[in-house]
Amino acid sequence: MKSAVYAFLYLDRMNVNQLVRERTPMPIKILQRRIEEVVLDCRILRYPKWMNTDRVMVAGDIKHAIKTGCFLAPDESRDPNSYMTAQDHAARVAWLIKFADLEKVTITIAENKVVDGNHRLSACIYSKIKVINCVVMPTTSKVSVIAA
């Protein structure tokens, strides 16, 4: 089930690790993983917990957002680290459930933490999707050369 692809990538996400902050080229693994494995490895209880929020989002929040048509579309100008209520997170997840192809979404994992894609992961969990694409960033700067 695990298919690996190796590539070099520059990332702009803040606070992932020193390699990213220094914009150092890193080997990146892209895997298809069972969502239940991701949840266990990343120690997620039910749904991811965001740092800047009022409380943990629950399935009822997502269900209510879908039922009431409260959908929050992606916005590139929105700071991903800014404060959002649990209802705002649920509206973002609801938008993904309604409009995104969840079979094709990708999340980014570094040091057993989802560093990009918590809303996508939440949408997949709620929709009972079995497999998700994961970009797995290494925790070390050592690069292995792999012949193609």
Model-derived regions, located:
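An acidic, glycine-rich, mixed-charge low-complexity segment common to nucleic-acid enzymes
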Residues: 5-67, 79, 83
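Short intrinsically disordered terminal tails
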Residues: 1, 26, 146-148
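Short alpha-helix boundary/capping and kink motifs at helix termini
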Residues: 61-113
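Short, Lys/Arg-rich amphipathic alpha-helical interaction segments
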Residues: 133-148
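Ordered hydrophobic segments in well-structured contexts
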Residues: 106-108, 122, 133-135
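Short glycine-/polar-rich loops that comprise or flank the Walker A/P-loop
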Residues: 130
